[in-house]
């Protein structure tokens, strides 16, 4: 049996992970990943990809796990089944696009022993439904936890895209209400000095990677996303977990797993993701 959450300990492990095309059935126009590896459009390639994603999640043993770039509820359930098989971790599954398939959405895994204290909803007015909210009731105290995937800047229409990002952030802030007992996480698709991220920090949220509870990796940077081809990769920090001041942080981590296969197998995908998972460990008291 895997570890179960205990209300007595009040410690919650929260993971945010962009899994890069976490689909059981890829859209027909997707043939490669962000770092230039081809993506075979086969069942075995996608299933192996999701199994490796589940393996990475299982090592972190999160109580709550938000997943970006998921393609369906079935794909979220596939990851959950692998976590049960490999680690004995049992989760309930949620997906921001409901039963719809074929578009990127946000998946959510909630460890089953948390269910009596939890309620999951879609964030109102969040464009493309790429956000889920979790209300966690601890006695008389209510925590709000949100996982998002903000608009990409891939099309390089920066002004337009950042305006949409700020609109999405506002939808989250509106749902949370007063900045108390709240945690925001996900792929925000922008760097720490950008206006959208400043909108979050100006609303009384602090990034946990910027805190004194952050445990650095040996590589000595805080990159969470990587791009570029033919060995010319570069990194940036666009995945975050933010918290209000009244949420106690035990520690925070960027999980520095190996993302790319040392020897490429043409029948499988060349990397698990162009992102690294971000883990926050909190004491909810």
Stretches found by the model and what they are:
Residues 25-28, 77-80, 119-121, 157, ...:
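Short, solvent-exposed loop/turn and secondary-structure capping segments
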Residues 1-82:
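N-terminal, active-site-proximal structural segment of metallo-dependent hydrolase catalytic domains
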Residues 40-51, 69-73, 125, 159-167, ...:
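Soluble non-cytosolic domains of exported or imported proteins
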Residues 1-5, 176-182, 189-285:
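Metal-dependent phosphoester-hydrolase catalytic domains
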Residues 14-19, 52-77, 134, 145, ...:
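Active-site beta-strand/loop signature of hydrolases that rely on acidic residues for catalysis
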Residues 64, 68-150:
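Structured beta-strand-rich core segments of catalytic domains in phosphoester-bond hydrolases
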Residues 147-160:
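Active-site His/acidic residue clusters
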Residues 72-74, 100-103, 153-155, 189-195, ...:
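Active-site environment of divalent metal-dependent phosphoester hydrolases
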